[in-house]
């Protein structure tokens, strides 16, 4: 019986009758039950690793056949069909116990062996470089695979096996350690220089992958995520990542010298020599069925390797450059080397992409720096530059790199990457900042009444900014903006550009209103009223303007002339025209608003005061061209001025000096009417005092010759408020009197 037990042909445990089925057992049987009862929790509570109770290791065919035959013979019982003697039953129980203990010991030995292998593997694995000897990875993988001893297949119950989950966790941890070691060894091999020894070391490592994958799949069936496989793409990515870093370090050194082109050729030659053997090894492993890796042919591997290699090189080189190197200069140097050296297509593509990324990075950095400087200058107050605003120059410098980026289609595609701001968005930000800065600075200058700085802003700084905004508008409105977000930003740029285009006209309008306001305040404070304008007529006309006229006109107009110095006449004319119109208009409005009445002497004095405007324009310090002065004096406001003076100079004679006239229209001479010369712009000096009683005939002839020149009728210079100006005369006709009905009245005041 002992020999039968050693042979392993024992009956199966699954059909053993329970010992508790014999209530009348002996003491020895009860002792046996007490000894074996401690193991029942293992027998009935042990989970099965696979469905149907099949163990997850291969079972020999002969063992299975003997096992089934013995089980069938055991079920048949004795040949005679009689009952089993009690002594034989006791021996049978002892034999079953011994058989069970033997199976448990064999199972414990196998578990201890695999646990010892897993613990030893986790302790001895290190991230060091691979040694020159044979790789221990295949042996480690075989040690961790479960191969139970012969006869140790223990089926405890239907669908149950003994040890899968006992070893699942340590083997899963060991598989993770193996994965880390393989990855580190692949990285270490990638850092090695190209040599024949590199291929042999890589071959040893790659041929160990099938055993690792077998272990990984079995461990994965019990512990999901225990370890990852090493497909061809991962192997190539690990190798090219390290080799790309090595190539990038060589190129970084060459960028600081002058041998970049030669270094590129040398790197490509070395990788080209190494590539056939390396791809042959990777392709051989990929084609093996046990590895489970499938990839295309050698051409696909070749292209994939070159692409991954130079992509890793470009990424590493970009990191090596850092923010302390000029990306634009590096991109130009690298582009020049690519154009001179004959390189693989994948190399040129990846390095050209790196050049564009560097240019994009340079543009973004320069825009950021310039934008921050512009914001700092805008917050710093007025610029110290005498001819231009420093903030305007900084804002203007933001546009050229953005325009270059929009003009370059390939660079524009790189800008459209989600991680980087697009040039269209930066252009919109620049336009918004420019518009807000201009409006704020214009309001600041006008509030402080600094017309020189204001005119410098709109005549010197605004035109270049407007030109850049229009260029950005033309590029942003093209159909090449394919992205929807770019099209939306382009619409916003169009709206802002339209607002900026209206700034010159709107600014001059606001400037004219401010000039009118300042002049009105000055006339309100300094222009006299009352008797000053109602004096009797003197024999000599006034020869000097009043003090208030020079004070108010020079206070408002001189800063304007100072701000326009150095500008071309085309830029001076609009601002001066607005300023003159505002000042003279405020002068006339002040007279009408306060109802100042003028005698003939007062009207002549007012005419002399108006001459201050022309005298100021003719001063040499302002360097105004004669054509510009002539253009300014052609303004319609001076025609209104001449009309107002004409109304005031049409003074009727006082009542005491009026005598009865014959009823004839041609005899009406009591009203002195002046005529303007041919040019209304020179009428400020052509309106002379009319003839009054007591003047000499010589003075009368001279006055008539001065005022008798050809020109338009006085009605041509009178505006809609003609009656208001006529009402300001000291001596007036009746409101209903008309010149052609003068013969109907006996006197002007009747």
UniProtKB/Swiss-Prot annotation:
<dbReference type="InterPro" id="IPR056901">
    <property type="entry name" value="CC142_N"/>
</dbReference>
<dbReference type="InterPro" id="IPR055350">
    <property type="entry name" value="CCDC142_C"/>
</dbReference>
<feature type="region of interest" description="Disordered">
    <location>
        <begin position="1"/>
        <end position="29"/>
    </location>
</feature>
<dbReference type="Pfam" id="PF25081">
    <property type="entry name" value="CC142_N"/>
</dbReference>
<feature type="region of interest" description="Disordered">
    <location>
        <begin position="687"/>
        <end position="714"/>
    </location>
</feature>
<feature type="compositionally biased region" description="Polar residues">
    <location>
        <begin position="693"/>
        <end position="707"/>
    </location>
</feature>
<dbReference type="InterPro" id="IPR026700">
    <property type="entry name" value="CCDC142"/>
</dbReference>
<dbReference type="Pfam" id="PF14923">
    <property type="entry name" value="CCDC142"/>
</dbReference>
<keyword id="KW-0175">Coiled coil</keyword>
<protein>
    <recommendedName>
        <fullName>Coiled-coil domain-containing protein 142</fullName>
    </recommendedName>
</protein>
<feature type="coiled-coil region">
    <location>
        <begin position="87"/>
        <end position="110"/>
    </location>
</feature>
């Amino acid at each position: 019986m002992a020999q039968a037990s050693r042979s392993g042909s024992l009956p199966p445990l699954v059909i053993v009758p329970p010992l508790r089925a014999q209530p009348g057992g002996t003491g020895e049987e009860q002792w046996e039950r007490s000894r074996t009862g401690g193991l029942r929790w293992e027998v009935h509570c042990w989970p099965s690793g696979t469905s149907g109770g099949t163990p997850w290791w291969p079972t020999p065919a002969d063992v299975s056949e003997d096992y089934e035959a013995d089980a069938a013979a055991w079920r048949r019982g004795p040949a005679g069909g009689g009952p089993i003697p009690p002594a034989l039953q006791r021996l049978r129980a002892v034999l079953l116990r011994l058989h069970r203990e033997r199976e448990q010991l064999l199972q414990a030995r196998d578990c201890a062996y695999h646990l010892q292998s897993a613990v030893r593997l986790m302790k001895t694995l290190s991230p060091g470089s691979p040694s020159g000897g044979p790789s221990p990875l295949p042996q480690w993988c075989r040690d961790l695979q479960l191969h139970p001893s012969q006869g140790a297949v223990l089926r405890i119950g239907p669908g149950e096996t003994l040890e899968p989950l006992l070893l699942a966790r340590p083997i899963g941890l060991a598989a993770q350690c193996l994965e880390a070691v393989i990855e580190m060894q692949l990285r270490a091999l990638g850092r090695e220089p190209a040599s024949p020894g590199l291929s042999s070391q890589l071959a040893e490592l790659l041929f160990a992958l099938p055993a690792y994958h077998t272990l990984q799949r079995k461990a994965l069936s019990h512990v999901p995520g225990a370890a990852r496989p090493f497909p061809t793409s991962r192997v190539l990515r690990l190798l090219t990542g390290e080799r790309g870093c090595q190539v990038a370090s060589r190129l970084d050194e060459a960028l600081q010298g002058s041998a970049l082109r030669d270094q590129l050729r040398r790197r490509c030659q070395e990788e080209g020599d190494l590539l056939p053997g390396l791809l042959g090894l990777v392709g051989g492993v990929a084609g093996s069925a046990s590895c489970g890796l499938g990839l295309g042919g050698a051409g696909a591997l070749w292209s994939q390797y070159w692409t991954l290699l130079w992509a890793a090189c470009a990424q590493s080189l970009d990191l090596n450059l850092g923010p302390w190197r000029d990306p634009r200069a590096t991109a130009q140097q690298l582009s020049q080397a690519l154009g001179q050296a004959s390189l693989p297509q994948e190399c040129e593509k990846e390095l050209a992409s790196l050049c564009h990324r560097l240019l994009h990075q340079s543009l973004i950095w320069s825009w950021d720096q310039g934008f921050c400087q512009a914001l700092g200058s805008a917050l710093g107050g007025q610029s110290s530059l005498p001819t231009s605003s420093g903030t305007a120059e900084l804002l203007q410098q933001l546009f050229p790199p953005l325009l270059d980026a929009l003009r370059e289609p390939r660079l524009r595609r790189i800008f459209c990457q989600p991680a980087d701001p697009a040039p269209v968005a930066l252009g919109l930000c620049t336009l918004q900042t420019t518009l807000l800065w201009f409006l704020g600075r214009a309001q600041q200058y006008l509030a402080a009444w600094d017309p020189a700085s204001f005119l410098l802003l709109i005549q010197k700084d605004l035109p270049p900014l407007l030109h850049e905004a229009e260029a950005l508008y033309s590029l942003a409105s093209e159909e090449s903006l394919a992205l929807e977000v770019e099209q939306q930003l382009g619409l916003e740029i169009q709206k802002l550009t339209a607002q900026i285009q209206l700034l010159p006209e709107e600014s001059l309008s606001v400037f004219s209103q401010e000039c009118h306001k300042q002049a009105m305040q000055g006339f309100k404070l300094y222009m006299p009223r009352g008797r000053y304008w109602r004096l009797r007529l003197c024999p000599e006309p006034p020869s000097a303007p009043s003090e208030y006229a020079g004070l108010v006109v020079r206070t408002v107009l001189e800063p304007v002339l100072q701000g326009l110095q150095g500008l071309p006449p085309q830029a001076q004319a609009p601002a001066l025209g607005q300023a003159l119109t505002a000042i003279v208009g405020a002068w006339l409005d002040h007279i009408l608003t306060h109802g100042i009445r003028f005698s003939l002497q007062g009207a002549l004095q007012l005419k002399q005061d108006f001459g201050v405007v022309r005298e100021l324009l003719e001063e040499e310090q302002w360097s105004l061209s004669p054509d510009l002065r002539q253009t300014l004096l052609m303004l319609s406001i001076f025609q209104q001025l001449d009309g107002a003076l004409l109304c005031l100079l049409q003074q009727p004679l006082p009542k005491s000096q009026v005598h009865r006239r014959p009823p004839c229209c041609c005899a009406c001479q009591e009203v002195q009417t002046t005529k303007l010369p041919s040019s209304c712009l020179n009428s400020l000096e052509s309106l002379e005092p009319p003839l009054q009683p007591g003047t000499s005939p010589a003075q009368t002839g001279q006055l008539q010759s001065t005022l008798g020149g050809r020109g338009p009728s006085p009605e041509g210079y009178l505006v809609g408020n003609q009656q208001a100006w006529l009402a300001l005369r000291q001596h007036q006709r009746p409101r209903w009197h008309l010149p052609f009905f003068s013969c109907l009245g006996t006197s002007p005041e009747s």
